[in-house]
Curated annotation (Swiss-Prot):
The active site is at 8 (proton acceptor), 130 (proton donor). Pathway: Amino-acid biosynthesis; L-histidine biosynthesis; L-histidine from 5-phospho-alpha-D-ribose 1-diphosphate: step 4/9. This is 1-(5-phosphoribosyl)-5-[(5-phosphoribosylamino)methylideneamino] imidazole-4-carboxamide isomerase. The keyword Transit peptide does not apply. The gene is hisA. It is found in: Cytoplasm. PANTHER family: 1-(5-PHOSPHORIBOSYL)-5-[(5-PHOSPHORIBOSYLAMINO)METHYLIDENEAMINO] IMIDAZOLE-4-CARBOXAMIDE ISOMERASE. One of its GO terms (biological process) is L-histidine biosynthetic process. Its EC number is 5.3.1.16. It comes from Hydrogenovibrio crunogenus (strain DSM 25203 / XCL-2). It holds the Pfam family His_biosynth. One of its GO terms (cellular component) is cytoplasm. Its main location: cytoplasm. It comes from the Bacteria.
């Protein structure tokens, strides 16, 4: 199972939000490339980058920071989300060498767009599904919809998405541990990989996720825990690799 460090971008800086609130951001670094280097040096094999301004404005705002990381680490796969609402944006990111584009809110508002994107860029599209008590939330978590997360996940699987990034939003950025049951239920219902996000705080969470890797959980995104120190990234990835072999 891949442990994937998150670099959330706001106004050109690396930050973490609590519960998706733009005015509740902790700034961790103004040097994005140095932050990426820190995780690469600790053994990261992929980066998860989110353009937070882009997510709220509906178009890329921090693309330059993504491109700088891409240039500094040409062999490192990057997955990017936030503000991806049209095929042109996806094309620009992929041409720059980004590996995966993550469609979030637009996937729920306009599911046809996911099918279009998968057709145009097969193998490069992921969907980010945020859910609270099994129901999908959108618009920076401001709105909980009446869409069931498993039903939508199946639809996107049929469209050809590469993976689903699943966040239990009751827990993200709050250091409460992972919602194993909800993550497992989604993974078991689908055949494509699930990347767990939200609530990973320590090595125990990695141990818990490792028990459902066989159900289709291929990765876990970690943010606040590695920035605030409750999880050592290098130890976390080493443990994950060890448990994957077991």
């Amino acid at each position: 199972m891949l442990l994937i460090p998150a670099i959330d971008l706001k106004d050109g800086e690396c930050v973490r939000l609590r519960q998706g609130l733009m005015d509740d951001a902790t700034v961790f670094s103004g040097d994005i490339v140095a932050m990426a280097e820190r995780w690469v040096n600790q053994g990261a094999r992929r980066l998860h980058m989110v353009d937070l301004n882009g997510a709220f404005e509906g178009k890329p705002v921090n693309g330059d920071a993504v491109y700088q990381v891409r240039e500094a680490f040409p062999d490192l796969p990057i997955q990017i989300g936030g503000g991806i609402r049209d095929l042109e944006t996806i094309e620009a990111y992929l041409k720059a060498g980004v590996s995966y584009c993550i469609i979030g809110t637009k996937a729920v508002h306009n599911p046809e767009f996911v099918a279009e994107a998968c057709k145009a860029f097969p193998g490069h599209i992921m969907v980010g599904l945020d859910a609270k008590e099994g129901m999908v939330a959108i618009n920076g978590w401001a709105e909980v919809t009446d869409h069931n997360v498993i039903d939508l996940g199946k639809q996107f699987e049929n469209d050809g998405v590469e993976a689903i990034i699943y966040t239990d939003i009751g827990r993200d950025g709050m250091m409460q541990g992972v919602n194993i049951q909800a993550t497992q239920a989604l993974a078991k219902a689908l055949n494509i990989p699930i990347i767990a996000s939200g609530g990973i705080t320590n090595l125990d969470d990695i141990r818990a996720l490792a028990t459902i890797e066989k159900d289709g959980v291929s990765g876990a995104i970690t943010g606040r825990a590695i920035y605030e120190g409750s999880l050592n990234f290098k130890e976390g990835q080493a443990l994950s690799d060890e448990l994957s072999k077991a």
